[in-house]
């Protein structure tokens, strides 16, 4: 069976991650400027760096998508036109937008950029997807909470010109597509403005209000239980099913993660996509490869029903470390290695 090859979209939180994602086979990367992106702590790109980042990617045949997907307050809206114009002038291929006002302004001030609707919009049905298409969106990033059957329905009931993007790998959120106020309440950091402190990963214990210091025996380890702790998503064994469901773009989460993560995960999915497109058996080495990056226990997300939660602890699995980076290789195969 001949299958289309969807776009592989990889995270590029800073220069190192951008170069790694491009070198390891991304078709497109997504990144942010210094404002209006949902990962304030990813490093991101200054106004001076963005055009160079776009050129680096374009020179290697890779597209650049920029996130403008926070929910801006009225006091920030006046800053948007100049920001959007800079992105337009830098040659950015697409803007990932969540707010309707920002979406409208993007059409006016960044006319050369396609407009993609962020997962922050929690698009979970075909009516919503079609409505955004009618407004001018060329792609929707579906909510992470959808099953494969629901994705098939959205694909079947929306214009074929509307592209469908879904996450295939990375962290998941305890709240609906990231719409959460726990971080605001507990730390004063706004999750909907790129500053999530991830309190859902904190260690919690239950205590009855009239019995201070007396804890209910719900502990999974000596520090407490992790009642809101979700697993990470990994679909590397199910890429063909995502393609068959009508997905046009597979997105890897992780702009705040390491360059090593960007390289390994991008490379693994790149090989799997190429094997599927060529009709080759998929080498199981690529499933092993994604185990080598720092991650929580894996699941397939909501694609096959309700995912499990991992209550034991919130720690990452970090069994492997990067020991060196090959920075160059000559025609004789002699490599330059940075330790």
What is each stretch, according to the model?
Residues 1-12, 17-23, 28-35, 60-70, ...:
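Surface-exposed amphipathic alpha-helical tracts and adjacent flexible/coil segments at the periphery
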Residues 18, 50-53, 100-105, 126-128, ...:
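Short, charged beta->alpha transition segments
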Residues 39-58:
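Glycine-rich, positively charged N-terminal anion/phosphate-binding segment
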Residues 40-43, 69-77, 92-96:
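Short gly/ser-rich anion-binding loops that grip negatively charged ligand groups
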Residues 41, 119-123, 142, 260:
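Alpha-helix capping and helix-loop boundary segments enriched in small/acidic/polar residues
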Residues 54-55, 107, 155:
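Short, cationic motifs built from Arg/Lys/His that form the positively charged side of catalytic pockets
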Residues 78-118, 123-124, 130:
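Well-ordered mid-protein domain cores that form the structural environment of catalytic cofactors
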């Amino acid at each position: 069976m001949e299958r289309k090859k969807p776009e592989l979209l990889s995270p590029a939180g800073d220069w190192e991650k951008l170069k790694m994602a491009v070198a390891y086979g991304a078709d497109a990367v997504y990144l942010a400027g210094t404002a209006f992106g949902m990962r304030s702590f990813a490093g991101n790109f200054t106004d001076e760096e963005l055009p160079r980042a776009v050129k680096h990617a374009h020179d290697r045949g890779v597209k650049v998508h920029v996130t403008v997907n926070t929910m801006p307050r009225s006091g920030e809206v006046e800053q948007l036109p100049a920001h959007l114009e800079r992105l337009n002038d830098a040659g950015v291929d697409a803007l990932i937008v969540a707010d309707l006002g920002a979406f409208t302004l993007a059409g006016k001030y960044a006319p050369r950029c396609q407009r993609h609707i962020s997962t922050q919009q929690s698009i979970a049905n075909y009516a919503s997807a079609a409505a955004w298409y009618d407004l001018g969106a060329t792609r929707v990033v579906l909510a992470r909470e959808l099953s494969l059957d629901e994705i098939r329905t959205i694909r079947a009931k929306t214009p074929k010109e509307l592209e469908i993007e879904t996450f295939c790998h990375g962290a998941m959120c305890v709240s609906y597509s990231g719409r959460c106020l726990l971080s605001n309440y507990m730390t004063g950091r706004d999750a909907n403005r790129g500053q999530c402190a991830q309190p859902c990963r904190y260690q919690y214990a239950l205590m009855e209000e009239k019995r201070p210091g007396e804890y209910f025996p719900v502990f999974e380890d000596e520090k407490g239980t992790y009642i809101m702790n979700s697993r990470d998503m990994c679909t590397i064994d199910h890429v063909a099913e995502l393609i068959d469901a009508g997905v046009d773009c597979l997105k890897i989460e992780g702009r705040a993660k390491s360059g090593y993560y960007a390289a390994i995960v991008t490379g693994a999915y790149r090989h799997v996509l190429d094997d599927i497109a060529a009709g080759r058996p998929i080498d199981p080495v690529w499933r092993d490869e994604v185990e080598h990056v720092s991650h929580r226990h894996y699941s397939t997300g909501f694609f096959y029903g309700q995912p499990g939660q991992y209550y034991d602890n919130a720690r990452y699995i970090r069994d492997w470390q990067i020991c060196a980076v090959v920075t160059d290789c000559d025609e004789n195969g002699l490599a330059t290695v940075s330790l």
